[in-house]
């Protein structure tokens, strides 16, 4: 009965003492509340009964405390049971001290306590830099049992040790729980110093490890380059190869020698600007260079060429993620006004402990216009120690003001040889077996991006024990060169069925049509350029043996053109497989004879002189010598051969027969890469039919001549049989007018008269020229004063060919200006008993020609 009454009195006293300690500590955090009770706590023992809570007993000797600890079934571990003084006197090695473990079972009736002083693997853990244990986090979530692990940081004196042992409110150790919500943004706010209270509410207190190294800026180490201060490793978890082998110094950058040299010179000479702009393709090292440059700006090493050294306090704090003067951000955050204001305020203040305050903005092309305006307006108000490093892969999207106020550095694509060397080093360091051909293939497919190459290498290392070329083909989804050469050989050998089967197999299992046609084009270009690999396969050598002649090379060039045209159709088509199959079948349609005819025709055209003959209204005005007549005969033979070649190349047999029987090539002029071909037809129906097929005719001319072609179609009408009425002539004129506007190429539509006999008068005819949908004015020439209008004629056989002419303007009247409309007149042949005056009165207006400033005068 007395024992029960004694415990009932002790419990309120114990609670009162605990409350008093907490109130004093909260009221005055700088004061150690237990220091007032140091004399009482020198010999103290905490004990809890099985059912009666905590009782405080004072003992006079530490031995009694140890003896009482053995009798106490449950409670705190007594102070006297540890030989702390012996360990402190021997050197206070934290790694040799064991931590105290309290295991609280869920059973309220039976509790047991255990302590361990030496078995660290089961009952405790070492104190190393206050780093949280991953195993503890995993054990925190176990059900049915609540187990907590405390780590104790020893003090430097016995009195302080006793006070901290008695009151956990002033302890500076760090506890981590699996359900603990850590706010990393408030690490600088240390609070009152309370790590956790007795209500078991966990609180995070950031470690102030920088205070351990502030007194040693260069950290001389132990003589072997190692630092005395132990820092946590930031490569604990396994990462991808691109992250693991990210450059940490300028020497590790690949393929950017010019940029590295310029940045090192900037640091050496101290010519630091406010804004740097790193631009270039993705995966070329822009972001890594910005981080290295930021660390080099604040590095404390005396040797500028070795910055960042990685040994000084600034380098260690930055690379461990604790640098306060280097901030990395992205465009998404900066587009928020609150975050932007915070950044501007921070940039206006001097750095905390470093030399420069560096702001790295990645993907800066995503910043909005308002953000750019605010940054540029505030740039002059920033501290002179603030440096901005902008990183972008799309330079054209940045405002011009940013480009003019920044120092730009272009990061070019990394060459395949450098990428291959880097990948080989990674494989050797990681112990990965590889084929050199596979590494070279990865480098060629990375398109100058080292990061993409490292990612592909990382994926291949997960697929098998050895990286091979076939494995790389399967991963990337491309076809090997041997398979491409087999398909190309089948397509060019007119093996239709096998070509279709092979193409469908490739597209069904490995590759899409767009990528297949691109690979075929690349293989053909390599063969034409003469690029041969050192270790060429048997398939490649066999293909090169068959296709080495000039005729086969011409076939390959034609195949490249067909594939280029097919790629345009594939981009706009939903059925890409069909279009690609059609393109492959077209590779064997053209035989060698057509190519030989093509080349011969072009060589003859290049040797020809300009074919244009002059004529006048009367025969005999121009007397030709025998040499000129012989040259003209040769030219006529050349024109006839060209015309025959053009008609033979027409796809339609009916069009081929029509052009050969009903049409004639009368003149062909090649000037400055443009050929002008004049065709003659004898009826309006023939002209209309030729106009409907003008595209096919133009394609045939371009295939033979190899240059742009302007087609002029002339209608030859005999003066003895003029149109029966003016209405028929007008309909003929407007019919030709409508056809000319539909033509894509520049065309000449001319109505001609045949003047074989000298007694016939030439009839005035109509000429139209279309240029981008406009009808142009032709030259007007007056050959005599008796005629009201006269034509400038151009014919190789003395025929009178008329151009668009203007009516005769009597003296005293104003001549129309160049930009005014020109009238087109119809003049009929003179009959018996009619004079020029009578005929001019019978002329009537049948059309109006639009002016064009580009027309030739």
UniProtKB/Swiss-Prot annotation:
Alphabetically sorted, this entry's keywords are: ATP-binding, Coiled coil, Metal-binding, Nucleotide-binding, Zinc
| Compositionally biased tracts (Polar residues) | 834-843
Protein residues bound to Zn(2+): 299, 309, 312, 315
Segments of skewed composition (Basic and acidic residues): 599-610
Output the GO biological process annotations, alphabetical, semicolon-separated.
Answer: DNA replication
User: GO CC terms for this protein?
Assistant: DNA polymerase III complex
In Pfam terms, one family for this protein is: DNA_pol3_delta2
Instruction: Write out the residues that bind ATP.
Output: 280-287
Q: Which InterPro entries match?
A: DNA_pol3_clamp-load_cplx_C, DNA_pol_III_sug/sutau_N, DNA_Rep/Repair_Clamp_Loader, DnaA_N-like_STI, HLD_clamp_pol_III_gamma_tau, P-loop_NTPase
Q: Could you tell me one molecular function GO term of this UniProt entry?
A: metal ion binding
Give positions of region: Disordered: 593-629, 787-845
- The UniProt entry's coiled-coil ranges are 544-576
Q: Which PANTHER family match?
A: PROTEIN STICHEL-LIKE 2, REPLICATION FACTOR C / DNA POLYMERASE III GAMMA-TAU SUBUNIT
Family of this protein:
Belongs to the DnaX/STICHEL family.
This one is known as Protein STICHEL-like 2
The scientific name of the source species is: Arabidopsis thaliana (Mouse-ear cress)
